[in-house]
Amino acid sequence: MPSLSSLCPDIVLIGAGIMSSTLAALLRELDPSLSMVMFETLSDCGQESSYAWNNAGTGHAGNCELNYTPQRADGSVDISKALAVNTEFDLSRQLWAHWVREGRIADPAAFVQPCPHISLVWGAENVAFLKARYEAMVAHHCFADMEYTDDPAVIAQWAPLAMAGRDTTQPVAATRIREGTDVNFGALTHALTASLKTDRSVSIHYNHRVTDLTRTEDGRWRVTATDTESGHAITVLTRFVFIGAGGNALPLLQKSGIPEATHYAGFPVSGLWLRCTDPAITRQHHAKVYGKAPVGSPPMSVPHLDTRVIDGKSCLLFGPYAGFSTKFLKSGSWTDYFRSLTPKNIIPALTAGKDNLGLLDYLVKQVIQTNEARFQALLDFYPTARPEDWSKVVAGQRVQIIRPDSGLHGKLRFGTELVKNADRSLVAVLGASPGASIAASVALQVVQGCFPERLVEGDWLPRLRQVFPAYGVDLTQDAAACATLRRDTAQVLGIASEAG
């Protein structure tokens, strides 16, 4: 017979990816007495956007992603977004280091590896931009370790494959931060859920699709999940629901009926990678090398040639190549997008489409792009690449947020966003990049935004300070605290850089 805590849990989490597993593990740190139920449609955790080959595993820290540092009209570079992403990743480092110290995660090398983050550009205009970006960033303590060079010989030491066979008459430049990371968010999700399953107050139900999410008269949430194999349904009552279901978060949010979600819509974007697993090639490249997106293309199109370490093996990934699919998840239905349109969000969706014809044009061109054209993009990064060494891999689905910015006029937003109802009893994660890299930041925002009454000295606050040693400290302003924190977390996680 099911226990009372499993029928009336304190917390229900929908989705068993990196977002839900991170929040569940953090809540357990703050209050081990909380009972939690997690529902996942698939047969295991971390199989959608958290799965290693469904995301770039960059450990987004604003080091190399040029779309986070736009150039102003006067030629100066705005680094505010890069700083925000950079210090959000510090939250992830603090949380992961805490779990390693506490034994929640046995081996950090199973999910995080040191990997330099490099920005590479060519052409006089792009070189001038990168130099201006470097000067703006290296002046701030968060990026003080950034290196810059326009010497092809030095770049060849940093990223040999990127320079072999390159036209040396063309201006080229690069920046590097040695202490970057490659993160296997699928492996991290598995480690967290394995730890959660040892707790009798946590119940995880795989092969269970949430089919109903309604409010009861007493203010609780009735959540019904149906076993996708047997058809048997489970119904639980809870005071708090977290929707961390990736692309499927929007339909679930709509199912809840909260007014805050009324006009939200989603725009699904699929993706492709090229992958190389030949050790003779992969051993020659150890870095995340990000380029500059073509003029007029969306932020999601920033090309990069990445080292990935998956299941202990080093691989190379290049992309992303965008596409269009009406699915909200890789395992979803072709009808997902159409079923998400309602009388209240179709106008925001249409106006967002009208305002983003450039994006639509880009996606159409990407969809009809030939394999030869895709490979040409790789040759821009790796001039001596051979087609026979690379295979095509379908990436995870992303659902970009569309929300009204004035009246019913919809605005397409790139990023990750939390949507919660007025009494803070339900919250959902919407959006895409930086996504998994800021799971710790998202979890902390949920705690702060939905449980403020518990963040006091006699309750969760002291423990929260233990989990996040720099809690309440603005790392963008406190250089000493930032340096200490990064040194300590690098040592615990085994990601300290080596000179060279």
UniProtKB/Swiss-Prot annotation:
GO MF terms held by the record: 2-hydroxyglutarate dehydrogenase activity; L-malate dehydrogenase (quinone) activity
Catalysis: reaction(s): (S)-malate + a quinone = a quinol + oxaloacetate
Recorded superkingdom: Bacteria
Cofactor (UniProt): FAD
Annotated keywords: FAD, Flavoprotein, Oxidoreductase, Tricarboxylic acid cycle
Record carries keyword Flavoprotein: yes
Pfam families recorded: Mqo
GO biological process: tricarboxylic acid cycle
Coiled-coil regions listed: none
EC numbers on record: 1.1.5.4
Pathway it works in: Carbohydrate metabolism; tricarboxylic acid cycle; oxaloacetate from (S)-malate (quinone route): step 1/1
Family that this chain belongs to: Belongs to the MQO family.
Stated name of the protein: Probable malate:quinone oxidoreductase
Organism field: Gluconobacter oxydans (strain 621H) (Gluconobacter suboxydans)
Classification lineage: Bacteria, Pseudomonadati, Pseudomonadota, Alphaproteobacteria, Acetobacterales
